[in-house]
A protein has these predicted regions:
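Perimembrane loop-to-helix junctions flanking transmembrane segments
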Residues: 37-55
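Transmembrane helix-loop-helix hairpins at the membrane interface
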Residues: 62-221
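Interfacial helix-start motif at the membrane-water boundary
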Residues: 49-69
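Membrane-targeting and insertion segments and their boundary/processing signals
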Residues: 5, 44-48, 166, 182
Length: 221
């Protein structure tokens, strides 16, 4: 499959995703009319909204560039993975949790630079410590069960975004409805990864999706 064909899959998937969002919006409105006591307005993405208001440039970089790269390493790297993608998966989760110990008052540019250098170093070390032949069995197993992995990673991807709305993980109908678009996005991004067989394509669709969301949210401020 050449670059042009992969680009068509990317663009087609983006428009399919937009269509799914429109269908979701219609059903969401209908459900609200059927269940007037269903309260979703009490849940807000406070951190994201504050970042958009106080520092739009930071929000743009974090939402459209950083989040797609990091999150695709965490989730879609398990779909038909290459050796380097499996190394990325092994490395990114420990790095992600270690970064939570970085003080909150560290300037975001410095934190982002540190994250990039730290991640690059960790991936390099991971490649040296994990030979290609050692990952072959795992890669073959993951490829064999790609449909199951696709479902699981899409669902987990959606559910981890619950913490956008609440400090601690909890679930109810209102929160499920709020994260449902992330689950839909997870499936479509995974579809692109499976078909284009390369993680950057998944990152690209994720960035396009987040860019669209950023645009509409910023206009609404």
């Amino acid at each position: 499959m050449n670059l042009s064909e992969k680009s068509v899959i990317l663009l087609r998937s983006f428009f399919y995703l937009v269509g799914l969002y429109l269908l979701y919006g219609f059903l969401f409105t209908a459900l609200h009319n059927l269940l007037p006591n269903l309260d979703t307005s009490s849940y807000e993405q406070r951190f994201i909204m504050e970042m958009l208001t106080e520092n739009p440039l930071r929000a743009l970089i974090m939402i459209v560039i950083v989040a797609p790269v990091i999150e695709e390493m965490m989730f879609r790297s398990l779909l038909k993975p290459s050796h380097i993608e499996l190394v990325l998966f092994v490395v990114i989760w420990p790095v992600f949790f270690l970064l939570r110990f970085v003080p909150l008052d560290v300037h975001w540019v410095l934190k982002l630079t540190f994250t990039g250098v730290f991640l690059f170093t960790a991936v390099y070390i991971g490649q040296q410590l994990i030979p290609r032949e050692r990952t072959l069995t795992v890669r073959n197993w993951l490829s064999r069960y790609e449909f199951l992995i696709w479902i699981i990673t899409s669902l987990v991807f959606g559910f981890v975004h619950i913490t956008n709305y609440v400090d601690h993980f909890t679930i109810n109908l209102a929160l499920f409805l709020l994260i449902l678009p992330r689950i839909l996005a997870g499936f479509m991004i995974g579809w692109v990864k499976i078909n284009n067989k390369n993680l950057p394509w998944a990152m690209a669709l994720h960035a396009m999706n987040n860019g669209m969301a950023f645009f509409f949210i910023y206009l609404s401020l």
